[in-house]
Amino acid sequence: MTKAEYDRLLTAAKSKKNERLYLLMQTICSTGIRVSELKFITVEAVERGIAEINCKGKRRQVFLPKELRKMLGRYIKEQKRKSGAVFVTKNGNPLDRSNIWSDMKKLCKTANVSNKKVFPHNLRHLFARTFYSLQKDVVRLADILGHSSVNTTRIYTMETGVIHRRQIEKLGLLRC
């Protein structure tokens, strides 16, 4: 998924008045968390600015960007949530992967994005590629994503042949 496609999905969620999905997608994409880690985005985490993630027997801290905290804070007030998970069903249960996947797929036509590209995990990939393109620090990215191996993180940062070709053309090492 490209940044432009992500932006169109956000616009579609907003136009359909699906505030929960609009914020959920931004939460995943601006923090790099896994869908299964959304339950750790709590009212308390938003107040602190840090989510404590316990996953796969490991703990890590995820920092919530200031603008995200503001948006989530408004949403929490509107939803009258006092504590616990921010993203819940109408019954108050944490959202699961299938709810999120289904909601995202419903945006595809409006957003003009292929439904083959729209998966919650692709938001995590977009975060990773964007972070890496700015920072070029795969070790720090591995820490942020909660990977124990940098080799796992490299999968997220691999670029397409088109990008490689463009970079090679710019090297300027040929004299004609």
Regions found by a protein language model. Name each.
Residues 1-7, 57-67, 81-83:
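DNA breakage-rejoining catalytic core of tyrosine-based enzymes
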Residues 31, 35-36, 40-74:
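Conserved tyrosine-mediated DNA breakage-rejoining catalytic core shared by Y-recombinases
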Residues 26, 30, 124-148, 155:
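C-terminal catalytic core of tyrosine-transesterase DNA break-rejoin enzymes
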